Amino acid sequence: MTQYASPILTSLLDTDAYKLHMQQAVFHRYPAISVAAEFRCRGDELLGEYADEIGAQIALMSQLALTDAEFDYLSGLPFFREDYLNWLRDFRYDPQQVQIENHAGKLHIRIAGPWREVIMWEVPLLAVISEVVHRHRSPDVTPEMAVAHLRNKLAQFKAMSSDVDISRFKLMDFGTRRRFSQAVQQAIVGTLKNEFPYLVGTSNYDLAHQLDLAPVGTQAHEWFQAHQQISPVLANSQRAALQAWLDEYPDQLGIALTDCITMDAFLRDFGPQFAQRYQGLRHDSGDPFEWGEKAIAHFQKLGIDPMSKTLVFSDNLDLDKALALYRHFYQRVNLVFGIGTRLTCDIPGVKPLNIVIKLVECKGKPVAKLSDSPGKTICQDQAFVKALRKAFDLPLVKKAS
């Protein structure tokens, strides 16, 4: 099987933009902090048989390095400082940080080391796992098949949206981590760029570079999770994370993720200063209509015009769900829809993987994601979940996975 000895990943930038945006903030603020992250398959699929092949790809990742052209590209963007880019130029993946094993048929992966390095593994490694599994399960699928299905969906979208002013609809590709393959993502995003006028960007830095699209993404759950152990007082940790992000990016990348604890706990922390300075909020779990109404009501309560803010929806979206949300909200707030798996792994006969890699420890102590969807809660330490719920004044119920 020599075809599988070649690397799936060929660019250090083949990852989500928010990884570099967060990595720079960690590089500047928390260079000495260590973390651990673990792989979770949210379904009951047994992926352990692919461990050796995934391990071989992990070893190949150590060869990835920023090219001169990529360095110049990042230097031309408004987000990055010179000290970070010079460090990133020397960055190499260290496969020693990754433990991978086939545990009775289940795929076990744990990544540990300095946060500023570990932060880079999640997205490309998930993309590798997804591509390895799909090329075994669906060896005959081609990018052309994915594009044909996309064109059907775009035609359907056009028909379904004909009775509404769609001019303010904005789509972002968020599909790197669970894509069928790199070739499929490239074909899908390239097709959207040429055929769908509402595409405003991609989360993938390599594709943004190649296709001349806006790179999009701010921070992930891990930013808030790590602050649970960085902040001296647990109850202040979310505010500390929000403030540290503003300190790094005072007037850009200002979309805040709301569901690390829960939306209600987030809004209690998201007072007038934060609400004015952040450009908007991102939804990633729970009922999106209810969430959007809460966000709009919160801005109004603070005397802020919701039309000056943006809501980003990114939880398990497809074009139909995005259109329903657009119809509901577009006259009251700015909207962006981040669609991932339903763009880059939406091919008839192919079952996408429901896989994640999440932070589980910071400074050797537990961190948790509670979220607005019980099935998305992640933490191994029940005592810590209890402490977190108490600190954020939440009922002590939902069990962690």
UniProtKB/Swiss-Prot annotation:
It catalyses: nicotinate + 5-phospho-alpha-D-ribose 1-diphosphate + ATP + H2O = nicotinate beta-D-ribonucleotide + ADP + phosphate + diphosphate. Transiently phosphorylated on a His residue during the reaction cycle. Phosphorylation strongly increases the affinity for substrates and increases the rate of nicotinate D-ribonucleotide production. Dephosphorylation regenerates the low-affinity form of the enzyme, leading to product release. The keyword Cytoplasm does not apply. The modification Phosphohistidine is found at residue 221. It comes from the Bacteria. GO terms for cellular component: cytosol. InterPro entries: N/Namide_PRibTrfase, NAPRTase_N, Nic_PRibTrfase, Nic_PRibTrfase-Fam, Nicotinate_pribotase-like_C. Pathway: Cofactor biosynthesis; NAD(+) biosynthesis; nicotinate D-ribonucleotide from nicotinate: step 1/1. One of its GO terms (biological process) is NAD biosynthetic process via the salvage pathway. Its EC number is 6.3.4.21. The keyword Phosphoprotein applies. One of its GO terms (molecular function) is nicotinate phosphoribosyltransferase activity. CDD domains: PncB_like (cd01401). Catalyzes the synthesis of beta-nicotinate D-ribonucleotide from nicotinate and 5-phospho-D-ribose 1-phosphate at the expense of ATP. This is Nicotinate phosphoribosyltransferase. It comes from Serratia proteamaculans (strain 568). The gene is pncB.
